[in-house]
Every structure is written in structure tokens, then in C-alpha cells.
């Protein structure tokens, strides 16, 4: 079976393991985008350490879960967000986060993958990849 969206698969795997109260999740296949998204989630304190395991194919990522995720998932289609959109959070973004202060959007910008809070500090826009709260 072909995996059409590895990022959606990774975020769903994390969410499912979190709901089952597992201490770790194994994500496969691994990619640079998934690793950068995990770094953004780790920086916000939603997940613990993670480790890339090279198995000679596409690799695996073992993520330590902390039990702090209520919901996470991909945003499809990937909406482009301008800097001004991040300040007001348009309607199609509000359906992913419960409020302006709770949770983060994960955005791919020209300076790398970061949360929407970091993008507001940097004053740049990007493309919405996923959400976590």
C-alpha cells in the first residue's frame, strides 16, 4: 500500500499512541520534514526525546510521549498563511485550534518549520502543515 501523506501518517500515529497511553510511538517512514515537525513539537513541550533509526530503507523514528497531547493532526489542504493572517487567525484555521492561546499551528516557512508563535515573532508567513494542542 502506498503512503500518500507521510506527515499525516506520523501525526495520526502520535495521536493514536497518545490516546492508548503508550510511552513511545514508532513512526515510519521517516523524512526530514517529519523530523523538523517533531523538533517544533518538542520545543513546545508536547513530546519528549526522539531518535532516528536507520534501517537501510526509509528509516524509523522512535518518539517518547509525555501525555500532554489532547489532539494533533495534519491540515489538508495546506493553506498558505500570510503574516497578517497569523495575527487574526482566519476561520479555516480557527477550526483546528480551540482558542487563540491554546495549541500551536505548525508552519513551513522559508526559514524552516516552526510554530505560528515563532512565525509571528519572525514576522513571516508560510504554509500550514498541522496542529497540536
UniProtKB/Swiss-Prot annotation:
Keywords from UniProt, A to Z, are: Ribonucleoprotein, Ribosomal protein, RNA-binding, rRNA-binding
Q: Does the keyword rRNA-binding apply?
A: yes
Q: Organism's domain of life?
A: Archaea
> What GO cellular-component annotations does this UniProt entry give?
ribonucleoprotein complex; ribosome
Q: An example of a Gene Ontology BP annotation on this entry? A: translation
A single Gene Ontology MF term assigned here is: structural constituent of ribosome
- Cite a single Pfam family from the UniProt record: Ribosomal_S8
The record, for Gene3D superfamilies, names:
3.30.1370.30, 3.30.1490.10
In terms of PANTHER family, this protein maps to: 40S RIBOSOMAL PROTEIN S15A (PTHR11758)
Q: Partners and quaternary state?
A: Part of the 30S ribosomal subunit.
* The protein's role, per its UniProt record: One of the primary rRNA binding proteins, it binds directly to 16S rRNA central domain where it helps coordinate assembly of the platform of the 30S subunit.
Q: What family is it from?
A: Belongs to the universal ribosomal protein uS8 family.
Q: What is this protein called?
A: Small ribosomal subunit protein uS8
Amino acid at each position: 500500500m502506498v503512503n500518500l501523506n507521510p506527515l499525516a501518517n506520523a501525526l495520526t500515529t502520535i495521536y493514536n499512541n497518545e490516546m492508548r497511553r503508550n510511552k513511545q510511538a514508532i513512526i515510519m517512514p521517516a523524512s526530514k520534514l517529519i523530523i523538523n515537525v517533531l523538533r517544533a513539537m518538542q520545543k513546545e513541550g508536547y513530546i519528549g526525546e526522539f531518535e532516528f533509526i536507520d534501517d537501510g530503507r526509509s528509516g524509523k523514528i522512535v518518539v517518547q510521549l509525555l501525555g500532554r497531547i489532547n489532539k494533533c493532526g495534519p491540515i489538508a489542504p495546506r493553506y498558505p498563511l500570510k503574516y497578517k493572517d497569523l495575527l487574526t487567525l482566519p476561520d479555516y484555521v480557527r477550526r483546528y485550534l480551540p482558542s487563540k492561546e491554546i495549541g500551536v499551528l505548525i508552519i513551513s516557512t522559508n526559514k524552516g518549520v516552526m510554530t505560528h508563535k515563532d512565525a509571528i515573532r519572525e514576522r513571516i508567513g508560510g504554509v500550514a502543515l498541522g496542529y497540536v494542542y
